[in-house]
Regions:
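AAA+ P-loop NTPase nucleotide-binding core of proteostasis motors
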Residues: 1-47, 51-60, 64-185
Length: 185
């Protein structure tokens, strides 16, 4: 669907919505290998990042925009080629928001917010030929609108989370339990 959308981008009046991918599977099952093979078959540049190494911009570690910089480097600094590449973010399940914490979460929710901007399609300024921003490195603008984002993770507790949600009583709709908050029954 993604590359059909890119190919028909200017030909049709109807725009096909961008669809990124989520791959779920245990560690070592071949998610990364599958993405590498896909990029090779499609002859598009590929950048692979580990979500656990991503942090909010300004902190030690890679920010989410540095992944776009890696993609640009994989495309030999050809912006147009990079804009049709693939970014694979592995271990995405590790950056889930922590419950009931009052501490600054520089590698969880902040990364999620930064990632949403890229996944939906935005323009990002990234350095040419380098992974760090400094005054001496020229910047180019990369539009993420046509970049295919594939995220992968093991999601070990997913089955239990689904069971919990399915077993909950409905709180709205026809099956809602309509008790008054002052009922003691």
């Amino acid at each position: 669907n993604h590359y059909k959308r890119v190919a028909t981008d200017t030909m049709d009046e109807i725009e096909i919505e961008k669809s990124n991918m989520l791959m779920i599977g245990p560690t070592g099952c071949g998610k990364t290998y599958l993405v590498k093979t896909l990029a090779k078959l499609l002859d598009v540049p590929l950048a692979i990042a580990d979500a656990t190494s991503l942090t909010e911009a300004g902190y030690i570690g890679d920010d989410i925009e540095s992944v776009v910089s890696k993609l640009l480097a994989a495309a030999d600094n050809d912006v147009e080629r990079a804009e049709h590449g693939i970014i694979f973010i592995d271990e995405i399940d590790k950056i889930a928001k922590k419950k009931n914490t009052n501490q600054r979460d520089v590698s969880g929710e902040a990364v999620q917010q930064g990632m949403l901007k890229l996944l939906e399609g935005s323009e990002v300024e990234v350095p040419v030929g380098a992974n760090s921003k400094n005054a001496m490195v020229p910047l180019v603008t990369v539009n993420t609108r046509n970049i295919l984002f594939i995220c992968g993770g093991a999601f070990p507790d997913l089955e239990n989370i689904i069971k919990e949600r399915l077993n909950k009583q409905a709180s709205i709709g026809f099956y809602a339990d309509l008790k008054d908050k002052y009922d003691n029954d």
